[in-house]
Amino acid sequence: MAFTTTASGLQFEDTTVGTGAEAQPGRNVTVHYTGWLYDNGVQGAKFDSSKDRGEPFIFPLGGGMVIRGWDEGVQGMREGGTRTLIIPPGLGYGARGAGGLIPPNATLKFEVELLGA
């Protein structure tokens, strides 16, 4: 498979296509995720993982409670599916970075598994 690039610059690839309910804006979704820094096609340091904590993450899709790349990238997934997201800085943490773990203007790579939609 190959990555699809959206008009915003988000890249995504479904590594596993789910068969359950579809993630839609306005509904809470439950995901497991792992995030890495990503630079010129090379996966860098892991900065966060719900799997490491053993605790899924729940958020309202499209509600602006997460970075824009997640609101856009999780939409349309189906329960049971796994998607890889490559998120440019403008859809991530931008020039401010985050918490000393994510430098300013960082591109991010996430593996997201949709557990509930």
Stretches with model-predicted labels:
Residues M1-A117:
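Cross-family detector of peptidyl-prolyl cis-trans isomerase
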